[in-house]
């Protein structure tokens, strides 16, 4: 009987820890500078994923001028996408202002896109990105000098998969994408939350192991089963196009140090890795050094890299 009581207490602790963390340790608000959709110039587009028979929507940001332009297809992070998400819009507007076309799709099951990301594997989501690339290749409104992909957060898992399947991509960018499995990433995230709450390392490790496996599985069982053991490293090993991978040293969602270590161990000459001190999962400006939702150094790094890769 006592054993079951103990198990029940542990399970309840694991289930409610994320809520407690948010209530007891709320993040200190920062007045980040956010780009609003109303402040951008864009076209609403629609295209089709013929592989999985899905109608998809999105926003197309085209620079001023005649081109040719490099173009980037954004691969979304986890969850439902929103067209007014300031993180994505900050990147899209910067690239557009610097002569780069950006296709920001509606993630399947979001906004104007059919399908359901909750029951889709990374391989499924990669077909949506391939469809977006096909759309850009087929359009005749403006000339392009090259097309690449930008995987943001979870999209960093998908980006190298797309690069393996699509011929003639000009570049690949991963913004705070994990180089560990989703199982490892969830364990890292839960462990951090528990440590912040005051649990000792040994206890937090055990509770995080149970919590990361059970809470996410209960919330989204189909998705968890599809992606939990996905390993991105075999795809990164064979990447043969110019690739830029950016991490935030203070990322509490993705184990940036371990991710950078694994990537560097591949010794792939096509991959450039950079870690920004003082930035977390958004690659935001460090405290006291501005309030950009994505630090300007990272934005400049991405736009400069894309132009260089597209010109090769």
Per-region residue spans from a language model:
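Hydrolase active-site cap/lid region
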Residues: 27-28, 167-216
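N-terminal cap/lid segment of alpha/beta-hydrolase-fold proteins
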Residues: 27-65
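The serine-hydrolase catalytic nucleophile loop
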Residues: 81-92, 107, 257
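Alpha/beta-hydrolase active-site loop
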Residues: 119-140
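Short beta-strand/loop motif that positions the catalytic acidic residue
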Residues: 239, 245-247
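Short alpha-helix in the alpha/beta-hydrolase fold that links the catalytic acid
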Residues: 241, 255-265
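Catalytic active-site module of serine/aspartate enzymes centered on a nucleophile-bearing elbow/loop
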Residues: 279-283, 288-312
């Amino acid at each position: 009987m006592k054993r079951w009581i103990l198990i029940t207490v542990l399970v309840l602790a694991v289930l409610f820890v994320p809520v407690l963390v948010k209530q007891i340790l709320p993040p200190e608000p920062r007045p980040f500078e956010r780009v609003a959709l109303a402040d951008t110039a864009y076209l609403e587009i629609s295209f089709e994923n013929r592989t999985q028979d899905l109608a998809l929507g999105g926003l197309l940001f085209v620079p001023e001028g005649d081109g040719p332009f490099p173009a980037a297809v954004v691969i979304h992070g986890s969850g439902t996408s929103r067209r007014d998400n300031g993180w994505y819009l900050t990147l899209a507007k910067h690239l557009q202002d610097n002569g780069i076309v950006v296709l920001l799709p509606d993630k399947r099951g979001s906004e104007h896109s059919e399908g359901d990301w909750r029951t889709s594997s990374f391989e499924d989501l990669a077909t949506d990105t391939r469809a977006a690339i096909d759309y850009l290749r087929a359009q005749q409104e403006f000339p392009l000098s090259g097309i690449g992909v930008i995987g943001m957060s979870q999209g960093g898992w998908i980006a190298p998969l797309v690069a393996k399947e699509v011929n003639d991509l000009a570049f690949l960018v991963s913004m705070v994408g994990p180089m560990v499995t989703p199982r490892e990433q969830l364990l890292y995230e839960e462990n951090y939350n528990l440590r912040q709450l005051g649990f000792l390392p040994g206890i937090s490790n055990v509770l995080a192991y149970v919590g990361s496996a059970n809470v996410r599985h209960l919330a989204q069982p189909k998705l968890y089963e599809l992606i939990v053991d996905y390993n991105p490293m075999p795809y990164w090993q064979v990447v043969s196009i110019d690739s830029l991978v950016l991490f935030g040293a203070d990322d509490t969602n993705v184990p940036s140090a371990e991710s950078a270590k694994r990537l560097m161990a591949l010794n792939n000459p096509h991959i450039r890795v950079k870690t920004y001190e003082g930035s977390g999962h958004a690659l935001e400006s460090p405290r006291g050094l501005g309030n950009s939702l994505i630090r300007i150094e990272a934005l400049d790094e991405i736009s400069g890299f894309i132009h260089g890769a597209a010109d090769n």
